[in-house]
């Protein structure tokens, strides 16, 4: 009986460790190592699921925001990659704290980020969030002299029909973001 209890305890311990490690591996596979945000694949997966859920509510406008930092390359080239990394971490923290916990924030790569605003029924609310994100990212430029030229070009797209795919929504948001860049940067545009 004592041997059986010891073996059972050992087995339960192994299962607990396995469960924890499995969870750690899943989190690591979904997380951008530098910023702690969702990585591209995980962001796409979570946004796709949330879009499907929001699509059941006919009033949801399902906005996706694409963000590209203006003059980020200048920070990297002038002050080095460690300073660029510090800026990316600050931007990620700023994005995370500037939206609701139900919204999805991810780093697509380099200095590109996405934000999906869940359960939004008014386009004006989404545009107000985009304006706020422009402002809070611009405020980072006052934190360090190395970041003095930082701002963001932001594009917003809306899922106008129920069958739109996340990839299509992202392409539209990205086009709007490039329009913001071409029209002077430090602003948002919609498509």
Where do the language-model regions lie?
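Residues immediately flanking
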Residues: 67-69, 154
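Core hydrophobic beta-sheet residues of small sensory/regulatory alpha/beta domains
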Residues: 64-66, 190
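Catalytic core regions of nucleotide second-messenger enzymes
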Residues: 58-59, 107, 123, 137-153, ...
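Alpha-helical transmembrane signal-anchor helices
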Residues: 1-24
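Cyclic nucleotide signaling catalytic output domains
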Residues: 105, 128, 132, 146-147, ...
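Conserved long alpha-helical elements within nucleotide-processing catalytic cores of c-di-GMP signaling
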Residues: 26-30, 39-63, 70-100, 106-110, ...
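Residue-level recognition of strand-loop junctions within catalytic nucleotide-signaling folds
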Residues: 77, 116-121, 138, 159-160
């Amino acid at each position: 009986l004592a041997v059986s209890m010891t073996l059972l305890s050992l087995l339960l311990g192994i299962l607990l460790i396995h469960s924890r490690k499995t969870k750690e591996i899943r989190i690591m596979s979904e997380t951008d190592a530098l910023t702690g945000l969702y990585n591209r694949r995980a962001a796409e997966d979570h946004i796709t699921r949330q879009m499907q859920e929001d699509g059941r509510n006919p009033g949801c406008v399902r906005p996706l925001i694409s963000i590209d930092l203006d003059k980020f390359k200048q920070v990297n080239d002038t002050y080095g990659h460690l300073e660029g990394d510090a800026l990316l971490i600050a931007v990620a923290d700023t994005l995370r704290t500037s939206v609701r916990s139900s919204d999805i924030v991810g780093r697509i790569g380099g200095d590109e980020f996405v934000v999906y605003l869940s359960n939004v029924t008014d386009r004006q609310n989404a545009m107000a969030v985009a304006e706020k994100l422009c402002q809070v990212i611009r405020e980072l430029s006052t934190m360090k002299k190395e970041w003095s030229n930082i701002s963001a070009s932001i594009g917003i797209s809306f899922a106008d029909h129920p069958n739109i795919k996340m990839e299509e929504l992202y392409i539209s948001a990205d086009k709007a973001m490039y329009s913001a860049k071409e029209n002077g940067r430090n602003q948002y545009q919609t498509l």
